[in-house]
Swiss-Prot record:
InterPro entries: RsmH, SAM-dep_MeTrfase_MraW_recog, SAM-dependent_MTases_sf. Specifically methylates the N4 position of cytidine in position 1402 (C1402) of 16S rRNA. It catalyses: cytidine(1402) in 16S rRNA + S-adenosyl-L-methionine = N(4)-methylcytidine(1402) in 16S rRNA + S-adenosyl-L-homocysteine + H(+). One of its GO terms (molecular function) is rRNA (cytosine-N4-)-methyltransferase activity. It is an enzyme of class 2 (transferase). Keywords: Cytoplasm, Methyltransferase, rRNA processing, S-adenosyl-L-methionine, Transferase. Gene3D superfamilies: Putative methyltransferase TM0872, insert domain (1.10.150.170), Vaccinia Virus protein VP39 (3.40.50.150). It is found in: Cytoplasm. GO terms for biological process: rRNA base methylation. The keyword Transferase applies. The keyword Methyltransferase applies. Belongs to the methyltransferase superfamily. RsmH family. This is Ribosomal RNA small subunit methyltransferase H.
Length: 313
């Protein structure tokens, strides 16, 4: 999961006011092995960092399709991708930006043959830094957590209207939090909870760190992760994406996935392994690629990143 930034002011801001560096960017580009004139899908557009690097290598005959659930991110990425250097303007590819989730990908690219697919999973620094989105436990904000601002379910609804048992199950399953029942009990007793700060305070009291290992992360980290994953159907969407990709990749087309926690990585690992066993993929990464110490020093959020890649047979 991404590291938190408690210095960020609340509210929507322009792209220049957010700090976001794409993780494992060069490694992702290398594994994609981009073909000039090819068609590529960036399944997690974000602020467009990876998409920009892909676009620079595609050429005027190429086509980049990029999608994101987050309408705010789409608009910011659009502005970034329109800032084409003069020496690349005549060689810039066609770019199609789509407001869509992984699960909706099939209906948008049903007729496309893709040379490569990139997915950089999880939450972006931009989303964490905007306290108004409700993703961070280090800033006061509404309990929202929707990646798609127009989605129906919010974290506030889950926190305040889910039974104690169901809430504990969510925290355990999607946060891998062994203190889930204690935390769920404390949340239910503290209802109504309307803000991220209030929720973080309730969790911190209920799950005080008892040893050095527990002190390494904030007590609310896993619960906030669980709520975010549940609200946004992140793991179901990831499974949909991975199931859809093989039928859309051309022979030798590449799939590259960057994950940030064990739940995501396990799904990616199992999917690629099963695809290789079924003769669909050649695994390009026997073990996940991780960030160098130099990158971790520059960008601490890269510490937990794992990249896996495969080529279509």
């Amino acid at each position: 999961m991404d590291s938190e930034d408690n210095s960020a002011p609340r509210g929507e801001r322009g792209i220049e006011q957010f700090s976001h560096v794409s993780v494992l960017s060069q490694e992702a580009i290398d594994f994609l092995a981009i073909r000039r004139g090819g068609t590529y899908l960036d399944a997690t557009l974000g602020l467009g960092g990876h998409s920009y690097e892909i676009a620079k290598r595609l050429g005027a005959q190429g086509h980049l399709i990029a999608l994101d659930k987050d309408t705010n991110a789409l608009e910011m990425a659009r502005r970034r991708l329109e800032q084409v250097p003069d020496d690349l303007k005549e060689d810039w590819p066609q770019i199609t930006l789509l407001h869509a989730s992984f699960a909706e990908m099939k209906q948008h690219i049903a007729s496309k043959s893709l040379d490569g697919v990139l997915a950089d999973l999880g939450i972006s620094s931009m989303q964490l830094q905007d306290a108004g989105r409700g993703f961070s436990f280090q800033a006061e904000g509404p309990l929202d957590m929707r990646m798609n601002p127009h989605g129906d379910l919010t974290a506030e609804q889950v926190v305040n209207h889910t039974s104690e048992r169901e809430l504990a199950d969510v925290i355990y399953e999607f946060g891998e939090e062994r203190r889930s029942r204690r935390i769920a009990r404390a949340i239910c007793r503290a209802r109504p909870i309307r803000t991220t700060a209030h929720l973080a305070q309730v969790i911190s009291v209920a799950a005080r760190p008892m040893n050095q290992a527990e002190r390494r992360i904030h007590p609310a980290t896993k619960t906030f992760q669980a709520l975010r994953i549940f609200v946004n159907h992140e793991l179901d969407d990831l499974k949909e994406l991975l199931a859809s990709v093989p039928s859309r990749l051309v022979p030798r087309g590449r799939l590259v996935v960057i994950s940030f926690h064990s739940l995501e990585d396990r799904i990616v690992k199992d999917s690629l392994r099963d695809g290789a066993s079924a003769g669909k993929y050649e695994l390009l990464t026997k073990k996940p690629v991780t960030a160098t110490e130099e990158e971790i020093d520059r960008n601490p959020r890269s510490r937990s990143a794992k990249l896996r890649a495969a080529a279509r047979k």
